[in-house]
Regions:
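Membrane-inserting effector segments that mediate pore formation, membrane fusion
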Residues: 5-67
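Short, surface-exposed, charged/polar-biased interaction segments
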Residues: 41, 45-48, 67-70, 86, ...
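Membrane-proximal, non-transmembrane interface segments of integral membrane proteins
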Residues: 58-131
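Long, helix-rich, hydrophobic modules that act as membrane-proximal anchors or helical bundle/coiled-coil regulators
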Residues: 104-222
Length: 222
């Protein structure tokens, strides 16, 4: 098993994980030098790397990983389910590498910590057996492709506060969300307007969440 994946596994179930919340917002240098958490497996590994060079990608991955772990351990997984999953990956290195390795690859792509929190919520749903591994893969790709600036608009659609594109100047956001396969656009109206002598045709649509989008958002908003 890859060393980073192994340390990630140890950190995910570490007895000292509960102290992370107090330090998650501090800088990376403060994290790796803090006596209270510097022996945390994933921090210890990154500390060795970062002492050699100030690699911005490694620093970001450490922050995203700790954000993920902090969210994962917010006490809404039963001890039974948690231990069941822990035993599975401890006794199956291939499963551990496939699943935790995939999570690390995704975290390495993220810049916004909000995405790491979303991913952690999805992973918790998987551990609780609310979604399958295939669904986790599908939903995690949605997070990966999501523009974080579009999430507030997606939330408005999910909550029913926005149900069409009338008078909106950010249709591009609708098109981006539609490309993720989680909203439905249905024809509402079409009109022709003239601006500075140039004619344009505007088509407005009703907006709803499809079942896939509802399930995704039910997890993310929990």
């Amino acid at each position: 098993m890859d060393q980073l994946t192994e340390d990630f596994e140890k950190s995910l179930f570490s007895d000292t994980k509960d102290v992370l919340g107090d330090y998650i917002e501090v800088g990376v240098d403060a994290l790796i030098n803090n006596d209270a958490i510097k022996e945390f497996p994933i921090i210890k590994t990154f500390a060795a790397v970062l002492k050699i060079g100030k690699n911005i990608h490694d620093r970001n991955l450490l922050k995203q990983t700790l954000t993920f772990i902090n969210e994962f351990n917010k006490n809404n997984i039963s001890v039974e389910r948690l231990n069941e999953y822990k035993n599975q990956i401890e006794n199956d290195s291939k499963k551990c590498e496939e699943e935790l390795g995939r999570v690390l690859l995704l975290l390495n792509n993220f810049i916004d910590k909000e995405k790491s929190i979303m991913l952690s919520k999805l992973f918790k749903a998987y551990v609780k057996q609310e979604i399958s591994w295939n669904e986790f893969g599908e939903y995690s790709e949605i997070i990966n492709r999501l523009f974080i600036q579009d999430f507030s608009f997606l939330k408005e659609i999910y909550l029913g506060r926005v149900n069409d594109t009338t008078d909106r100047n950010d249709i591009y956001r609708v098109e981006r969300l539609n490309s993720l396969g989680i909203i439905v656009m249905s024809f509402k109206s079409s009109r022709i307007s003239t601006i500075n002598g140039v004619m344009s045709n505007r088509q407005d649509s009703y907006l709803t969440m499809n079942n896939n989008g509802k399930k995704f958002m039910n997890i993310i908003m929990n």
